[in-house]
Curated annotation (Swiss-Prot):
Enzyme class of the recorded protein, top EC level: lyase
EC numbers for this chain: 4.1.1.31
Reported function: Forms oxaloacetate, a four-carbon dicarboxylic acid source for the tricarboxylic acid cycle.
A GO-annotated cellular component: cytosol
Organism: Pseudomonas syringae pv. tomato (strain ATCC BAA-871 / DC3000)
Record GO biological process: carbon fixation; oxaloacetate metabolic process; tricarboxylic acid cycle
Cofactors required: Mg(2+)
Protein name (record): Phosphoenolpyruvate carboxylase
Length: 878
């Protein structure tokens, strides 16, 4: 641990020094001294020095308008460089004497444990190979880092790795340091913020770039290592066509609350994915053709290519031509609708079969060592990514479908669908689903919103089945929500089953999830349209915004239990899709612990979850780190499947019922029932300003109104910026305190010790409380909140203090995260750079609110940079 601290501080110091050189060169020594005075003041202030805190405060207050942006940029860059150093610590080269990180050894340790518990090697190999884990990449309004800069940051991490070699001579070390200096200068002189909002297509391209630069390399590497670990433990190999982890995407498919995602955008993104996949395989096949110059071949390969002197190259040449045809057609189809020529690859077998033929031939001819190199990697990619790279989900709000159905029934003279009761809707929808004639005449001319819903359904019907994931219905609350989408898809020409997935988001909808699915499974004809598991999406963000995380977490747990029970009774397989965010307030947290804390039976070999924009970058942005996170998913889903946790004891359920009730009351008393709260929220946080910033393609609000109209992401993002972190903990302080007052401390201790669900919740709560900072929150209040509302901020900070104390009591520590000195070190390192940014942001908000500033003014740009810097420093945003 001490070694890691020393190395981390060494790297941060080096990167900071190189950034300082760059700043001095551009703005002079006097300006750099000002930055240093601010940084040292922050550092001393953190150690309790009143003089240091005063130095920090007076230095920031004294900044001229034209200094605000470069100062904000300096601390933003410091934090991004600290992130790079921290990421590098997670994957740095280790000596043989150093233990492997947990992520690298988790699978082998799990397999040993499973064998010791009596699981047969064949069972382990079979279960591992047929796991179905799907990570759904989503765009994110708070992923503010530009792709250009991300690539430079990745290059900096590579140079840190080069610097880590022990046997470097002084000239080599100087050369690497010089490269680092150049990269940091490039980053400093690159504008870090987009001036215009990204389009949904831009966001999709960002997702494809993560695949191209990281996941494309990580997938074969993690599978190669998993195969090695499996073979060492069981003597068996991972089958060639096993892909335990695949990827889907919402980028270009998620139109919920985003009018910019149209049917045309979805079509464009599907074509871009095909183009990108063909392009990536072409690069692989070009390299393979250069390497596979051998002449000896199997009879099967000879039968395919004839008497060619270079049979492998001949087979790959044909595949290369088809990949080129596919890429060219996808590119041309972006501007006009064209029929696909014969040569275009349509089925994944057409990609896999030539590669398998070469692979098997090499093995048959005694060249297995060649087959098991880049050719095996290409095969693994082809199985994982297929011809379409990712499966695109479509998501739309249930109210849009209801409005479309109302317009249709109104037009047909059947009455208004929206006014019908649930049973009337179900009867009508089932009748029409089973009717062979179309519901709508070809000359029906719907209004714009309905036309867009129908156009999206037509794109779904026209797209290849393998290019699509699920059609997700947000704010679903009834069986008719699912049937309505099935009918709209049928009317649009869909002739195959499609996964239509209700997303249960509010507390009431989560409580009703079981009965809705039970109703659906009991309807005549529904199961024939299912063809596969019943997929249900659990919403973490909106349920937490609605009721606080105490009640939301328990509602999510109980909903999953009920769904498992119903599907087991109905003999239908269940796939739970977890809509988690990056933050604790949106269901985020370490994936490994989260998966192991799911209700027993809810994983069962299948797991689907969203990966949010800013977390995609931290978890999958670099190949080595992506590999570690893929390992964690693999091990956690295998463990949750074969070693599910025991069901909670009745006393624990009673306790959680009471705590959920106390938690939701305390949460809503502040957020919903206090008439001053919304005004305080808008004064104390940058919520209003966030709506103006070009942070993502989706608007920050669903509609005008109070907290309930806000999307969950800006709601949490705003509180994160001020370090109050309110949505992640509010309610827990009351729930836990009241349990202790009732003398139930022993039950709480038992729950934390024996129940993974509760332990994980408390661990995540502790993490967020460690990042919260009442002094920083007070600073925003003093600068921005009117005198008559300051009492509310003081009350919230008292509640924060109560939450910290009760968690310390529960964990038996004197300091939050005392059991994790490494995490404390990472937080402490950042605070010296975060504190000035918070102070600066409060100052910028004050100046911005007191004058009309245009969006591209230095003031607004500095504000945006401060937002980005704080997001980077805290490593989780919305």
């Amino acid at each position: 641990m001490a070694d890691i601290d020393a190395r981390l501080r060494e790297d941060v110091h080096l990167l900071g020094e190189l950034l300082g050189n760059t700043i001095r060169e551009q703005r002079g020594a006097e300006f750099l001294d000002k930055i240093e005075r601010i940084r040292k003041g922050a550092k001393a202030g953190r150690r309790g020095s009143a003089e240091g805190a005063e130095q920090l405060s007076s230095s920031v207050d004294g900044l001229e308008d034209d200094e605000l942006l470069p100062v904000a940029r300096a601390f933003n860059q410091f934090l991004n460089l600290a992130n790079i150093a921290e990421q590098y610590q997670l994957m740095h080269r280790r000596d043989d004497a150093q233990p492997l990180p947990f992520e690298s050894r988790v699978l082998s340790e799990l397999l040993d444990r499973l064998k010791a518990e009596g699981h047969q090697p064949e069972t382990l190999a079979r279960q591992l190979s047929k796991l179905e884990i799907e990570l759904v990449l989503t765009a994110h309004p708070t992923e503010v880092a530009r792709r250009t800069l991300i690539q430079k940051y990745d290059a900096i991490a590579t140079q840190l790795a080069a610097l880590d070699h022990r046997d470097l001579n002084s000239a080599e070390r100087a050369q690497i340091t010089s490269r680092l200096q150049r990269l940091i200068a490039e980053a400093w002189h690159t504008e870090e913020i987009r001036r215009i909002r990204p389009t949904p297509v831009d966001e999709a391209k960002w997702g494809f770039a993560v695949i191209e630069h990281s996941l494309w390399h990580a997938i074969p590497n993690y599978l190669r290592k998993a195969d090695h670990v499996l073979h060492a433990a069981t003597g068996l190999h991972l089958p060639l066509e096993s892909a335990p982890i695949r990827f889907a995407s919402w980028m270009g498919g998620d139109r919920d609350g985003n009018p910019n995602v149209t049917a045309a955008v979805t079509r464009e993104v599907l074509l871009l994915a095909r183009w990108m996949a063909a392009d990536l395989y072409l690069r692989d096949v070009d390299n393979l053709a250069a390497e596979l110059s051998m002449q000896q071949a199997s009879d099967a390969l000879r039968a395919s290519v004839g008497d060619s002197a270079e049979p492998y190259r001949a087979e790959l040449k044909r595949l290369r031509e088809r990949l080129r045809a596919t890429r060219n057609w996808a590119n041309a189809s972006l501007t006009e609708t064209l029929p696909a020529p014969e040569a275009v690859l349509r089925d994944n077998r057409e990609l896999l079969d030539p590669l398998l033929l070469c692979f098997q031939s090499l093995h048959e001819c005694g060249m297995g060592v060649i087959a098991d190199g880049p050719l095996l990697d290409c095969l693994r990619r082809a199985v994982t990514f297929g011809l379409f790279l990712v499966r695109l989900d479509v998501r739309q709000d249930s109210t849009r479908h209801c409005a479309a159905m109302t317009e249709i029934t109104d037009y047909l003279g059947l009455g208004r669908y929206e006014e019908w009761d649930e049973q009337t809707r179900i009867d009508f929808l089932l009748r029409e689903l089973n009717n062979r004639r179309p519901l709508l005449p070809s000359y029906f001319k719907p209004a714009a919103d309905t036309a867009e819903v129908l156009a999206t359904c037509r794109e779904v019907a026209a797209a290849p089945a393998a290019s699509l994931g699920s059609y997700v219905i947000s704010m679903a609350g009834s069986a008719s929500d699912v049937l309505a989408v099935q009918l709209l898809l049928k009317e649009s020409g869909l002739q195959r089953p499609m996964r239509v997935v209700p997303l249960f988001e509010t507390l009431a909808d989560l409580d009703n999830a079981g009965p809705v699915i039970e109703t659906l499974l009991g309807l005549p004809g529904y199961r024939s349209r299912l063809q596969g598991p019943q997929e249900v999406m659990i919403g973490y963000s909106d349920s937490a915004k609605d009721a606080g995380t105490t009640a939301a977490a328990w509602a999510q747990y109980r909903a999953q239990e009920k769904l498992v029970e119903i599907c087991r009774e109905q003999q239908v397989e269940l796939l739970l899709f977890h809509g988690r965010g990056g933050t604790v307030g949106r269901g985020g947290g370490p994936a490994h612990a989260a998966i192991l804390s799911q209700p027993p039976g809810s994983v069962a070999g299948r797991f689907r979850t969203t990966e949010q924009g800013e977390m995609i970058r931290f978890k999958f942005g670099l190949p080595d780190i992506a590999e570690q996170n893929l390992n964690l998913y693999l091990a956690a889903v295998l463990e949750a499947t074969l070693l599910p946790p025991p069901p909670p004891q009745p006393a624990w359920r009673t306790m959680m019922d009471q705590m959920a009730s106390d938690g939701v009351s305390a949460y809503r008393a502040v957020v919903r029932e206090n008439p001053e709260f919304v005004e305080y929220f808008r004064q104390a946080t940058p919520e209003q300003e966030l709506g103006r910033l070009p942070l993502g393609s989706r608007p920050a609000k669903r509609r005008e109104g109070g907290v309930e109209s806000l999307r969950a992401i800006p709601w949490i993002f705003a509180w994160t910026q001020t370090r109050l972190m309110l949505p992640a903990w509010l309610g827990w302080e009351a729930a836990l305190s009241k349990a202790l007052e009732r003398g139930e401390g022993e039950v709480l201790a038992q729950m934390r010790e024996q129940w993974p669900f509760f332990r994980t919740r408390i661990d995540m709560l502790e993490m967020v409380l460690a990042k919260a900072d009442a002094d920083i929150a007070r600073l925003y209040d003093e600068r921005l909140v009117t005198a008559e509302l300051q009492h509310l901020g003081a009350h919230l900070r008292d509640l924060l203090s109560q939450a910290c104390n009760v968690v310390l009591g529960l964990t038996g520590q004197t300091q939050l995260l005392a059991h994790s000195p490494e995490t404390l070190e990472f937080i402490s390192l950042r605070n010296a750079y975060l504190d000035p940014l918070h102070l600066l942001q409060a100052e910028l908000l004050s100046r911005s609110r007191n004058r009309e500033a245009s969006l591209d003014s230095p003031l607004e740009l500095a504000l945006l940079v401060s937002v980005a810097g704080i997001a980077a420093g805290l490593r989780n945003t919305g």
